[in-house]
Amino acid sequence: MRQVWFSWIVGLFLCFFNVSSAAQYEPPATWENVDYKRTIDVSNAYISETIEITIKNIASEPATEYFTAFESGIFSKVSFFSAYFTNEATFLNSQLLANSTTAPGDDGESEIRYGIIQFPNAISPQEEVSLVIKSFYNTVGIPYPEHVGMSEEQHLLWETNRLPLSAYDTKKASFTLIGSSSFEEYHPPNDESLLGKANGNSFEFGPWEDIPRFSSNETLAIVYSHNAPLNQVVNLRRDIWLSHWASTIQFEEYYELTNKAAKLSKGFSRLELMKQIQTQNMRQTHFVTVLDMLLPEGATDHYFTDLVGLVSTSHAERDHFFIRPRFPIFGGWNYNFTVGWTNKLSDFLHVSSGSDEKFVASIPILNGPPDTVYDNVELSVFLPEGAEIFDIDSPVPFTNVSIETQKSYFDLNKGHVKLTFSYRNLISQVANGQVLIKYDYPKSSFFKKPLSIACYIFTALMGVFVLKTLNMNVTN
């Protein structure tokens, strides 16, 4: 099931993610949105948005680019976005731009940012095409109210634009919220045509007609039920060590985790917590008692530590590593911890065809708990001493990459080759994304380390032997 989901993510991340210099910019009015259906899913610790849209080229010349608009506040939280034709499974080239437009908003002028979608073939004048645009954001609603009791249900307040935010005029539009059992508008407008209505587990708006471009002056504030933790990893340091001699790959992850859920309205009570656990009957709560770490299959030698020391409240079951922190993590609480495990190297390393000295390492970008967002991720892969990297490929855009050496046990020369990727705004959906590292590891380097160690040991033993043969006695 994960592989099926990952195939979708791979296509999504293969899009370009370039950023150009910021400038005041306004896309040409080449298109008209014939039908604009927007859906926002609030069921997770992050927001996902799907726009099903039919567009028409109203210019006099063929067009190959379509611009999608973002509010500046949400633009900085984009984890990734993609687009594809409705009737095809081929993803289109997509990229985020730094170009911006100043448009009127609720509080004066607001800044509009852009993503660009490029078509493989030009769209002729008066021709229509249907697209699906997907965006995921490393953000979620804020707790409303900010403080709740341990047994009370949590609600979140989310603000977004009510009408389509687009660089083009829209003929017909609708908007649907999904992912919660209850929705309620906060300060609903007087205009009844803008009001939403509940429909089962969704909240629907529209349809609206003839909406001008950049209609962002109608803000929607929605309160919805979300009785689950909001796991946010502020910093994740992920170290992965490859050993050709031991045929193992070792993982170690250091988490700085916080729960963005509602804070306790009263002080913490262990007695009340035990009562809550006994009476909740497996009902989901807004605090964390157990973290389910999703690990690669075949993982062994698990361990779980925190700043105090080894934590024994954990157990592994197949590819799941269940860890129980020393204390429940309520809203606003933090917990720093380290987990580690070992896998067979053959599950992650492949020999290139044509040479037994060229290797391809396939490293998962993330492991860890589901439904989690990551602000900063540092992924370091330690290759054997003497390895030479000649190509890397990451399905997720990284902010920085560096190559250096770092000495470890029995490193007598330069040390392990350390390849470090830095990422921002990741979500748990990319857990199966693979970083590919192609490198050379010649036989001479493979045997150099044990031979060097053997030479040092031999030299030491010979030194001891020579010292023993010397007559160190003092005589007259």
Swiss-Prot record:
Lumenal-side segments: 23-449
Alphabetical keyword list: Endoplasmic reticulum, Glycoprotein, Membrane, Signal, Transmembrane, Transmembrane helix
GO molecular function, one term: structural molecule activity
Membrane topology category: Single-pass type I membrane protein
Subcellular location: Endoplasmic reticulum membrane
Principal subcellular localization: endoplasmic reticulum
GO CC annotations, alphabetized: endoplasmic reticulum; endoplasmic reticulum membrane; oligosaccharyltransferase complex
InterPro entries: Ribophorin_I (IPR007676)
Transmembrane stretches, start-end: 450-470
Residue ranges that the UniProt entry lists as topological domain Cytoplasmic: 471-476
Function: Subunit of the oligosaccharyl transferase (OST) complex that catalyzes the initial transfer of a defined glycan (Glc(3)Man(9)GlcNAc(2) in eukaryotes) from the lipid carrier dolichol-pyrophosphate to an asparagine residue within an Asn-X-Ser/Thr consensus motif in nascent polypeptide chains, the first step in protein N-glycosylation. N-glycosylation occurs cotranslationally and the complex associates with the Sec61 complex at the channel-forming translocon complex that mediates protein translocation across the endoplasmic reticulum (ER). All subunits are required for a maximal enzyme activity.
Remaining remarks: Present with 11900 molecules/cell in log phase SD medium.
Family in the record: Belongs to the OST1 family.
Subunit (UniProt): Component of the oligosaccharyltransferase (OST) complex, which appears to exist in two assemblies comprising OST1, OST2, OST4, OST5, STT3, SWP1, WPB1, and either OST3 or OST6. OST assembly occurs through the formation of 3 subcomplexes. Subcomplex 1 contains OST1 and OST5, subcomplex 2 contains STT3, OST3, and OST4, and subcomplex 3 contains OST2, WBP1, and SWP1. Interacts with SEC61, SBH1 and SSS1.
Protein name: Dolichyl-diphosphooligosaccharide--protein glycosyltransferase subunit 1
Organism: Saccharomyces cerevisiae (strain ATCC 204508 / S288c)
